[in-house]
Amino acid sequence: MALERLFRRKRPSGGNRDVPELWTKCEACGAQIYKKEFQENLHVCPKCGHHHRLPARERVAMLADPGTFQEITRLRPLDPLGFVDTKPYVERLKAYQAETGRPDAILGGTCQIGGVPAVLLVMDYAFAGGSMGSVVGEEIARGAERAAEEGRALVIVAASGGARMQEAALSLMQMAKTVMSLDRVWARRLPYVSVLTDPTTGGVTASFAALADVIFAEPGALIGFAGPRVIRQTIRQELPEGFQRSEFLLKHGMVDRVTDRRRLKEELVRVLRHLHPGVAYAPGV
């Protein structure tokens, strides 16, 4: 018995420890990926190339030139309707804010992208599915106005399930507001570039996201108004293979280019330098 006790495995004491996960699993192919490699690869699977969702902060770090990003999105949402479903809207907002560290579903600021002055706005899908409510709409409108006033390009990275139902008509109103704000950018002949990521749906697709001078999309991104399941149930027909995915939209002229995330900044810089009136275009850059 003494010998058995000697070799018996002892359980570690101290309860649950905060040990970081070292591996992550690809949602598409199931490959086990070393988390550090996954992050360095911008959340793209090195095995199959599947593009996982990228946090807003990491998206900004990927696109903005180092040390140039100055945040301008600081508005906080209210609950003018006193909306309650299974729980009060204000409680949902507090939970999302605690989870993401963001006041709402958008992160934006002034920066340079490849030396081109820009206003960069990135939607955060982790906050209420990136839904567009009063704050998101107002921040986009203010960002567009800032770009026009300061002669900056406007770049918006979309990731959204659409309008925020808890704000009802106030949310739908943001579609018109964001579209109207783009007029100031175009009046100054400044470039507006949209990047559609997975997913971009609903009122976001039906408003500012689809109106850019140049529209990039990430590989495999779901892009559309209603989701495929809703459409299938409505028309009672099977949908074409790849329907509403970025490659399908490229084939049918709805986006200009499907670009791997790891090459996105390079291609974005090329477009901005070509279109921005205050930047001399250098062929081959």
Curated annotation (Swiss-Prot):
Its cofactor is Zn(2+). Transmembrane segments: none annotated. A zinc finger (C4-type) spans 26-48. InterPro entries: AcCoA_carboxyl_beta, Acetyl_CoA_COase_Trfase_b_su, ClpP/crotonase-like_dom_sf, COA_CT_N, Znf-ACC. It comes from the Bacteria. Pathway: Lipid metabolism; malonyl-CoA biosynthesis; malonyl-CoA from acetyl-CoA: step 1/1. The keyword Metal-binding applies. Residues 22-285 form the CoA carboxyltransferase N-terminal domain. It catalyses: N(6)-carboxybiotinyl-L-lysyl-[protein] + acetyl-CoA = N(6)-biotinyl-L-lysyl-[protein] + malonyl-CoA. Gene3D superfamilies: 2-enoyl-CoA Hydratase, Chain A, domain 1. Keywords: ATP-binding, Cytoplasm, Fatty acid biosynthesis, Fatty acid metabolism, Lipid biosynthesis, Lipid metabolism, Metal-binding, Nucleotide-binding, Transferase, Zinc, Zinc-finger. Binds 1 zinc ion per subunit. One of its GO terms (molecular function) is ATP binding. Zn(2+) binds at C26, C29, C45, C48. One of its GO terms (cellular component) is acetyl-CoA carboxylase complex. The keyword 4Fe-4S does not apply. Component of the acetyl coenzyme A carboxylase (ACC) complex. Biotin carboxylase (BC) catalyzes the carboxylation of biotin on its carrier protein (BCCP) and then the CO(2) group is transferred by the transcarboxylase to acetyl-CoA to form malonyl-CoA. Acetyl-CoA carboxylase is a heterohexamer composed of biotin carboxyl carrier protein (AccB), biotin carboxylase (AccC) and two subunits each of ACCase subunit alpha (AccA) and ACCase subunit beta (AccD). Belongs to the AccD/PCCB family. PANTHER family: ACETYL-COENZYME A CARBOXYLASE CARBOXYL TRANSFERASE SUBUNIT BETA, CHLOROPLASTIC (PTHR42995:SF5). This is Acetyl-coenzyme A carboxylase carboxyl transferase subunit beta. It comes from Thermus thermophilus (strain ATCC 27634 / DSM 579 / HB8).
